[in-house]
Amino acid sequence: MIKTKNCAIFGGTFDPIHLGHLHVIDHLLKSKKFDSLIVVPTGNPATRQAVASPQDRLEMVRIALGNREIEISDCEINRPGTSYAIDTAIELQQKNPDSQLHWVVGSDAFAQISSWHKIEELAELVEFLVVERPGSKISATKFKSDYIKIDALPISATEIRNSINGGLAIEEMLPANVYAYIKNKGLYGSS
């Protein structure tokens, strides 16, 4: 089938989703390069243990994205077992057969791309869209990829979780509604 549309897939643990994630999402939306954008919270990450439950992370994504015209997929959260990009790509390609899938990945994760589960098969299904961060070095790869430069915000979910647990202020790193959700649910040691 000829693929006449372009669909960006932005997956992540989103533990929690923060303004850095939203900055990338808004850049993708403003670029007008994609007919659709699907945000996919990871269900059971292969490389790290999520702190918040999958349901809380999904709800924070829903809250953060608000009325943006974006699809939020719960396919990984509903799938039992470890979440792998290949399984998600297969499922989303079946649901979007006329779309070329573009897998959004940060330059830090792209540096480790050769270690991903079934990477050769994944690379046949998607084109990687690498988000270059200031100061990052991207090595040449045999996988189809394109690069976008975004002035990334210096925010990390790990830093946010550690700051909450340590009682430090993090309001400037999160959308206000996500911060309220975290406080209300007592996530990451907040009270």
Locations of regions flagged by a protein language model:
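Nucleotidyltransferase catalytic core that binds NTPs
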Residues: M1-S191
